[in-house]
Amino acid sequence: MISGLLKKIFGSRNDRLIRQYSQTVRAINALEPEISALSDEALQAKTADFKQRVANGESLDSILPEAFAVVREAGKRVHGMRHFDVQLIGGMVLHNGKISEMRTGEGKTLVATLPAYLNALTGKGVHVITVNDYLASRDADWMGRIYGFLGLTTGCNLSRMGHEAKQAAYASDITYGTNNEFGFDYLRDNMVYSTGERVQRGLSFAIVDEVDSILIDEARTPLIISGQAEDHTDLYLKLNQVAPMLAEQEGEGDNVIKPGDYTLDLKARQVLLTEQGHENAEQILTRMGLLAEGTSLYDPGNILLVHHLYAALRAHSLYHKDQHYVVQNNEVVIVDEFTGRLMAGRRWSDGLHQAVEAKESVRIQAENQTLASITFQNYFRMYGKLAGMTGTADTEAFEFHSIYGLETVVVPTNRAMVRKDENDKVYRTAKEKWDAVIADIRGCVERGQPVLVGTTSIEINEFLSGELNRVDLSHQVLNAKQHEHEAEIVAQAGRPGVITIATNMAGRGTDIVLGGSIERQLAAVRDDETLTPEQKEARTAALREEWKPVHEQVLANGGLHIIGTERHESRRIDNQLRGRAGRQGDPGSSRFYLSLEDPLMKIFAGERLNAIMVRLKMPEGEAIEHAMVTRSLESAQRKVEQRNFDIRKQLLEYDDVANDQRKVIYQQRNELLEADDISETIRAMRQGVLHDSFRVHVPVDSVEEQWDIAALEQALASEFQLRLPIGEWLKAEPNLDDETILKRLLAAAEEQYAVKTAQVDPVAWHQFERNVMLQSLDTHWREHLAALDHLRQGIHLRGYAQKNPKQEYKREAFELFETLLDTVRNDVSKLLMTVQVRTEAQLEEAEVPPELENVQYQHAAFDEALGVATAPEAAQAAAPAGPKIGRNDPCPCGSGKKYKHCHGKLS
């Protein structure tokens, strides 16, 4: 009550921030007459002036009013677009490293030019991140004209670009690209074998468009670069026959209606075998010769078999054609559940994709091994400054703040929003719902009102399209199968009486203009070199005059009407669909039609509402329409959002362990790449490994009778090619102590190594040492990633032993990391001691880094394992970022030791 009273008196924090920004807006507006009076040359000269002032120590904040006024003027001169006052506020929010919530149609693309220009003055580069390649190239071209006019360079980072083109894109002042591509470039930059192969130049400032989609929806999905692993094709085919032989159990616990072999967890997308299922599966697998007689499904040797059996069951019971994937050109192509797009080249991991391929009888492609991985949370937190824009962030403000430290500021609209959001209509059956949807669509067509129908999957999209064809209602379909034409379809979706059916509208990036867009015709006139400026002006005016009455007709008919055919798991995605209507103060309306057979209703509200409908004896075709129903649905969505937040938070807690280790490995890689000579590091490693090997056979503080000299001589000869007569030394010198023997051993090793290196050019040998070290580090890091993955999959079982799974994971991951570093030290030392090189040609041959087969770039979901499109073969990748770990800083692994005494020892 008191906080509410204080808010009324002083306003909320959001109100106070907007008031502060509004004062700066007044300062920018005061500069407008002066800036407008400048010639083009004088306006362009401002950029060099600003850069000099920044170089002299002036802060960006003090330059901001004048810089924003310059960008606003450039927008007017280049595109005839003047930034509104609220867009200036949005730009300030972004510059301050916050999230700017701006409604659909408020011009977020133009807003980004303000902070991008200002921050590019530092020369460190600005990354503007969008959700797809089409928007990245469109915005880079469109806004790049403003930056180019002001003397800044613009780059576009696309997935099909070559290495040199990527380097040029990153060298630009402002670089546009997709979140996936920036993340993959970072990972690839940490797999290179020379500094010249890197493309990124550090992570300074990022502006993320559709920030909720990228930092929330896709944050459950790590970026994974993988290469081909062992082939298990026969196993997939055999287990594909087993899955249909096992039956689903209906009900759980005391409420089992029909016993079965497995239960489904629809929320977690998991399958669990019942006791009956274990027995049946073992019998079937034994009959098929996959399981040895008398062995259990859970014997250590059968771990792979269990893993693939579960994958086959998930493929058959949880992943459905035309909903989760489509079959195209004899391949299984995943459908992105957030956007409804086809994700060609992406693959589910953990054998699931191969199980689906076996189910659909298409060619089974080999499984992959993880080469590098990072989550979006950990990638974006490496930027020195991070900001984002979206139309719907307020519902997730807590998550943005708790995970990314980002505050959300709701920016007021330029014009008041007048869209009418009507209560949901809930029907008993899907048939009644679809009848009502078609009746509403028909009413819109008769009124001449454009209508956009949102669906949650391609399957429903195509079902509704078929129903509309049946009743002779012409329409256009926008889903993953037509994404090449999507911008044009969306642009024309505002014409009178046009029906557009679309899967998830998140990230479409194109405004629906009432009356239809004439941007393409205007662009054709602008680019027509046969026309004089006067003719261009006349044609442009004529096009606008033709469009005006159509626009006014749609306004009079009520603007765009939005129909939702199902509630999404997230309120935010429902709001994104609604937000397509009512842009820039236009009229519009929205309504959701639901049935008790919808997935979300089944899980959360179906039984209760069904009981109410039966009790009220509601006739067929009658709907419940009440604010209470809408509220209860939003409450159900909040529960799902909370669960998804918990999943993302848990993923982050586990990935933070891997991230700390990743930082150590990547820092050591970069130190290796940048060093001309690592011979001292190699020498220290060699002496450490020899010392450890010696102490295995000659323990500290032991007597001679406990020494195993014969085994020591054999180990030195076989592992290090070091043949020393230690037994004879002891016979000749009975008083020889262990420390003296160790010193002689180390001296002999150094002498032998020096003889070997003297045979070749020192520069070539140093390069060889570095490449051996890099290859060993990379190989064992990949194996370590797989080990961490397996550890994480089974760690929850520690809870049954009254242990904290997260603490156990941290402890065991640390032990695995210690083993990784020891293995690298051993491998490198032994290889360099045993390798026989006589010519520099042999060295050069050995230096060639191993070619990785079938490299794929996956964006695999944490629980649903979504994979990512293959990036260009020629494309290399990204540079290390984040603060460097000092030698005396605490080691990020959490041991409590200094970095130089812990994981910095390798360096």
Swiss-Prot record:
May bind 1 zinc ion per subunit. It catalyses: ATP + H2O + cellular proteinSide 1 = ADP + phosphate + cellular proteinSide 2. It comes from the Bacteria. It is found in: Cell inner membrane; Cytoplasm. SUPFAM superfamilies: Helical scaffold and wing domains of SecA (SSF81886), P-loop containing nucleoside triphosphate hydrolases (SSF52540), Pre-protein crosslinking domain of SecA (SSF81767). The keyword Protein transport applies. GO terms for molecular function: ATP binding; metal ion binding; protein-exporting ATPase activity. PROSITE patterns: SECA, SECA_MOTOR_DEAD. Keywords: ATP-binding, Cell inner membrane, Cell membrane, Cytoplasm, Membrane, Metal-binding, Nucleotide-binding, Protein transport, Translocase, Translocation, Transport, Zinc. ATP binds at residues 87, 105-109, 511. GO terms for cellular component: cell envelope Sec protein transport complex; cytosol; plasma membrane. Its EC number is 7.4.2.8. GO terms for biological process: intracellular protein transmembrane transport; protein import; protein targeting; protein transport by the Sec complex. Zn(2+) binds at residues 891, 893, 902-903. It is an enzyme of class 7 (translocase). Its cofactor is Zn(2+). Monomer and homodimer. Part of the essential Sec protein translocation apparatus which comprises SecA, SecYEG and auxiliary proteins SecDF-YajC and YidC. Part of the Sec protein translocase complex. Interacts with the SecYEG preprotein conducting channel. Has a central role in coupling the hydrolysis of ATP to the transfer of proteins into and across the cell membrane, serving both as a receptor for the preprotein-SecB complex and as an ATP-driven molecular motor driving the stepwise translocation of polypeptide chains across the membrane. Belongs to the SecA family. This is Protein translocase subunit SecA. It comes from Aromatoleum aromaticum (strain DSM 19018 / LMG 30748 / EbN1). The gene is secA.
